[in-house]
């Protein structure tokens, strides 16, 4: 079943152009010194993604947890690559999947066109993300039992859609930042068999708080471990430095909660 989002308040939360800014998400001194390797890889049919992972001077480095990172409506731009690098420095192999097949938007109108194109072929978008999971599961430096999906906005909705279609290749966790569309019915969500992290703002005009509360209720009723964090006074895309809703303090806190969630439910399990 394909869920079509309500875009009310969605465009207004974005600025006219994408912006790169991850300086607010601090790294510890030891993490700053982590060396990374990155490359473009073909992971599904004609889809290419940005792959980045930490490299060790030791030959004894074991297999690492991994993340399929799913872009916002802009596409795989420099901001997404910077976020992938940031997460890789925490010890993850990160594959930034591309649902736009190399296209990157530089204005809201083009971004909306690309979103609609991806949504109009939702089955292919899911197959694309499943291909990313399979690619990581076969990578020699990845622990195939510790693969997570993470996305923001459009990508958050796709992260959830992947969770609803991952029975063949189960995930370790699902993370969505104000994901649209937000699936809330218990029957659909009961397919998920792993922990879920949801990050939302209570002033989000695209995702009513009633939907967020129903999302949490359905997860709880289905016995799905979950952490749902709702930030007061912030709206849609508050973690996006491109937008008028950008909230640096809440973004930094949400990122720390994301890392803590990954540590608890992925790294330490």
What is the predicted role of each segment?
Residues 1-5:
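Sec-dependent N-terminal signal peptides of Gram-positive bacterial secreted proteins and lipoproteins
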Residues 7-138, 242:
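Serine-hydrolase catalytic machinery in alpha/beta-hydrolase-like enzymes
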Residues 99-103, 180, 234:
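Short beta-to-alpha linker loops that shape the active-site pocket of alpha/beta-hydrolase fold enzymes
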Residues 106-115, 180-195:
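Flexible "cap/lid" loop of the alpha/beta hydrolase fold
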Residues 130-191:
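Primarily recognizes the serine-hydrolase "nucleophile elbow" in alpha/beta-hydrolase
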Residues 192, 198-200, 204:
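Short beta-strand/loop motif that positions the catalytic acidic residue
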Residues 220-269:
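C-terminal catalytic histidine-bearing segment of alpha/beta-hydrolase fold enzymes
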């Amino acid at each position: 079943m394909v869920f079509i989002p309500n875009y009310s308040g969605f465009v207004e939360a974005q600025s006219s152009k994408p912006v790169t800014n991850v300086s607010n998400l601090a790294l510890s001194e030891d993490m700053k010194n982590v060396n990374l390797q990155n490359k473009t890889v073909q992971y599904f049919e004609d889809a290419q993604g940005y792959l980045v992972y930490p490299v060790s001077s030791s030959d004894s480095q074991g297999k690492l947890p991994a993340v399929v990172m799913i872009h916002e409506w802009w596409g795989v731009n420099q901001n997404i690559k910077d976020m992938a690098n940031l997460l890789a420095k925490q010890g993850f192999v990160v594959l930034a999947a591309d649902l736009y097949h190399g296209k990157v938007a530089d204005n809201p109108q083009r971004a909306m066109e690309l979103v609609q194109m991806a949504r109009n072929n939702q089955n292919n978008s899911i197959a694309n993300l499943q291909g990313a999971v399979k690619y990581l599961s076969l990578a020699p430096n990845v622990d195939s039992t510790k693969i997570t999906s993470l996305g923001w906005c459009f990508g958050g909705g796709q992260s959830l859609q992947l969770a609803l279609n991952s029975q063949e290749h189960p995930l370790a966790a699902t993370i969505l930042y104000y994901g649209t569309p937000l699936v809330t019915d218990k029957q659909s969500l009961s397919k998920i068999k792993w922990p879920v992290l949801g990050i939302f703002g209570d002033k989000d005009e695209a995702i009513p708080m009633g939907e967020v509360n129903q999302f949490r209720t359905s997860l709880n009723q289905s016995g799905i471990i979950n952490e749902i964090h709702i930030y007061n006074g912030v709206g849609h895309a508050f973690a996006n430095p491109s937008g008028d809703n950008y909230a640096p303090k809440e973004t930094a806190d949400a990122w720390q909660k994301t890392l803590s969630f990954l540590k608890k439910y992925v790294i330490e399990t």
